[in-house]
């Protein structure tokens, strides 16, 4: 007859226990760490689970074993699962000095668990015990720390009170998702003797906002399980309580960014007393989604009227005002009239100049997809199969040069592109190569008066966006008459 397992609560853990068993909810999970064990001559590994069995009790459980065992745990155990942890060893958590780097989430109790292959194990809890599973899974949405004890994004952006010192630290935030970008694959060289071997990592970038900073901050997610969950987050609907999220300065984005690290905990759509989440969602509903499309979507909202663009600038002046010595940090965009020559307009090349956006959410559709992948959009389309699901629009890179330099970021896009080129995006795709070449030479190496809208780099978009609002062909005499030195 099988021995009946005695399950205990996390609050009952004592450092002297060597066969501790409990039923708990997985609220976070690390990636498996696999290494070569010289003593046994085999590959071993460790997987860390962060578990919780009540609103006040949370700790970590490390699962050690042969690689096959750890890989099986990694595939079987997911965030949100209720599990039985059997035969674990209870370990006292050593004291960590303030500011000391941590490699796992901070526990709310003084002990942690260790499960060794052969003496203990972790399995999914019996599905027939529906009552306990339901109770424990509700903890997934209960805040781990008070929602009132969070910082505002504006405070983080200002350098946590030290704007002259860029520091790396961990903070607690209450934010709402504004945009979820596609997963990117990044190659990283492995350290040591295998330095020529490259590891393929996945990264998901999420833009989060709060009422103090509607421009948004970038949150990078690297852990595969959290990437999978983040892909289900809905813009303006998913609230995140971020615990110990890493804040650091990114040279690539040239601003402070957030990162999900080994010690970070995320509570999705926290359910707590008070109006914090309700007020945050109400604010998010007022923020347009297209604000975070950046350069991926060519059609920019609120295009200025052509007649309103009057300030003449050279290429050098545009760059100086956008990124150089003349920039004003309080101004995020401006307009300019540029007199110059079109020096690149590769309409007949191999690069595609037509993109597509979803008619429902107005977001860019990647070229490898037929329709928008959003569940909400798919549900919308299922109600009416005859309605077009996407709109094509121009997105053409154009180089403009004058006596001071070349503007390489300018783009002829959307409705202005159709007006200037004299045809729709759908019609352009049907042109023969000879016709595309003829269209190109109507502009290339010709002189134009170009009206531009310039959007300066911001934290969630680290590059300059320059959009052609209008352009008119001019004779050489007018170009010379409008030349300036700087």
Swiss-Prot record:
Keyword terms of this UniProt record: DNA-binding, Meiosis
Signal peptide region: none
Entries under InterPro entries matching the protein: MEIOB, NA-bd_OB-fold, OB_MEIOB_N
Stated family: Belongs to the MEIOB family.
UniProt subunit comment: Interacts with mei-9 and Ercc1.
Phenotype upon gene inactivation: Reduced meiotic crossover formation and sensitivity to the DNA-damaging agent methyl methanesulfonate (MMS).
Reported function: Single-stranded DNA-binding protein required for meiosis. May be involved in the resolution of recombination intermediates into crossovers in the meiotic recombination pathway.
DNA-binding region, residues: 166-285
Name by which UniProt lists this protein: Protein hold'em
GO molecular function, one term: single-stranded DNA 3'-5' DNA exonuclease activity
Gene Ontology CC entries for this record: protein-containing complex
Species in which this protein is naturally found: Drosophila melanogaster (Fruit fly)
GO biological process: double-strand break repair; oocyte fate determination; reciprocal meiotic recombination; resolution of meiotic recombination intermediates
């Amino acid at each position: 007859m099988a021995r009946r397992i005695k399950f205990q609560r996390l609050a009952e853990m004592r450092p002297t226990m060597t066969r501790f068993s409990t039923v708990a909810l997985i609220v976070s999970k690390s990636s498996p760490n696999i290494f070569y064990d010289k003593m046994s001559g085999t590959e071993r590994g460790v997987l860390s689970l962060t578990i919780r069995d009540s609103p006040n009790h949370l700790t970590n459980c490390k699962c050690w074993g042969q690689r096959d065992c750890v890989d099986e745990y990694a595939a079987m155990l997911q965030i949100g699962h209720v599990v039985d942890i059997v035969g674990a060893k209870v370990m006292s958590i050593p004291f960590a000095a303030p500011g000391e780097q941590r490699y796992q989430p901070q526990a709310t109790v003084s002990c942690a668990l260790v499960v060794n292959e052969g003496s203990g194990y972790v399995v999914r809890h019996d599905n027939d015990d529906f009552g306990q599973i339901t109770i424990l899974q509700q903890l997934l949405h209960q805040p781990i720390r008070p929602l009132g004890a969070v910082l505002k994004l504006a405070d983080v952006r200002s350098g946590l009170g030290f704007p002259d010192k860029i520091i790396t630290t961990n903070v607690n935030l209450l934010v709402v998702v504004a945009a979820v970008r596609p997963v990117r694959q990044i190659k990283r060289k492995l350290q040591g003797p295998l330095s020529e071997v490259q590891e393929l990592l996945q990264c998901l970038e999420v833009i989060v906002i709060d009422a103090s900073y509607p421009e948004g901050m970038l949150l990078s997610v690297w852990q595969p399980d959290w990437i999978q969950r983040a892909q289900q987050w809905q813009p303006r609907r998913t609230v995140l309580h971020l615990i110990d999220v890493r804040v650091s300065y990114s040279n690539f984005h040239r601003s402070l960014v957030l990162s999900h690290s080994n010690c970070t905990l995320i509570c999705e759509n926290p359910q707590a007393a008070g109006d914090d989440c309700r007020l945050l969602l109400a604010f998010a509903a007022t923020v347009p989604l297209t604000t975070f499309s950046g350069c991926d979507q060519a059609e920019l909202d609120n295009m200025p009227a052509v007649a309103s663009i009057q300030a003449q600038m050279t290429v050098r002046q545009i760059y100086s005002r956008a990124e150089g010595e003349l920039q004003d940090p309080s101004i995020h965009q401006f307009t300019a009239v540029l007199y110059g020559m079109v020096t690149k307009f590769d309409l007949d090349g191999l690069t595609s100049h037509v993109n597509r956006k979803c008619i429902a959410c107005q977001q860019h559709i990647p070229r490898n997809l037929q329709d928008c992948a959003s569940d909400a959009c798919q549900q919308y389309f299922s109600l009416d199969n005859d309605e077009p699901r996407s709109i094509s629009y121009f997105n053409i890179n154009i180089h403009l040069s004058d006596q001071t330099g070349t503007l390489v970021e300018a783009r002829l896009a959307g409705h202005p592109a159709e007006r200037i080129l004299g045809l729709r995006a759908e019609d352009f795709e049907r042109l023969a190569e000879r016709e595309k070449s003829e269209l190109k030479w109507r502009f290339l190496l010709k002189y134009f008066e170009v009206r531009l809208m310039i959007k300066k780099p911001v934290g969630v978009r680290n590059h300059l966006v320059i959009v052609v609002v209008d352009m008119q062909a001019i004779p050489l005499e007018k170009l010379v008459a409008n030349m300036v030195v700087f």
